[in-house]
Amino acid sequence: MKKLIPLLVLVGAMASQGQDWIVNFNNSNLPNTTQHPDRLVRSAPGGPGITGTNYQAVLLFAAPGGSLNPAQAPARFRVSTTLSPGTWQGGDRTLTGIGSTPGTQVQMQVAVFDINRFATYAAAVAGGGILGRSTLFTYTIPTPPLAPDAADLVNFDGFVVPEPSVIGLGLVGAAALFMLRRRKAS
């Protein structure tokens, strides 16, 4: 399992609505600086950002020690012709049942799956189709007014699925080496 470049999710602009909180679920394509580390989801460390609307990111949340639950609909990654590869088309997500008191802690995580293989997040979990997960992190609900960079998610872990052509080329190369060795032995 290879590490993907750390992905940071901008979780800001939380607003209280009774027992619900609204989170802006995005991974902005900001310059890679100390204040805004690289937030792109990459296919391999240092590789290009992933694209394709078949890939989806889902925000998971729970009270500390609780079970992670998906927050509403997943966010689709951008089309292959995008100028912002590695980012998804996010938006507001509602976190229900976590309390609304400043100081309340919420555990969060992001998971990525391919809807061409699994239609829903639950199906991807059941079928072992999660392509990567961020490290679980704790977010503390702040006292308003909120800072725009309220929390960052780090260390997106996943694995790279090789293209079928790479596997095929590897097999052709291995067969050629085998035949060459066999030819020299004759």
Q: Which stretches of residues belong to each language-model region?
A:
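Intrinsically disordered, low-complexity segments enriched in proline/serine/threonine
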Residues: 8, 39, 164-166
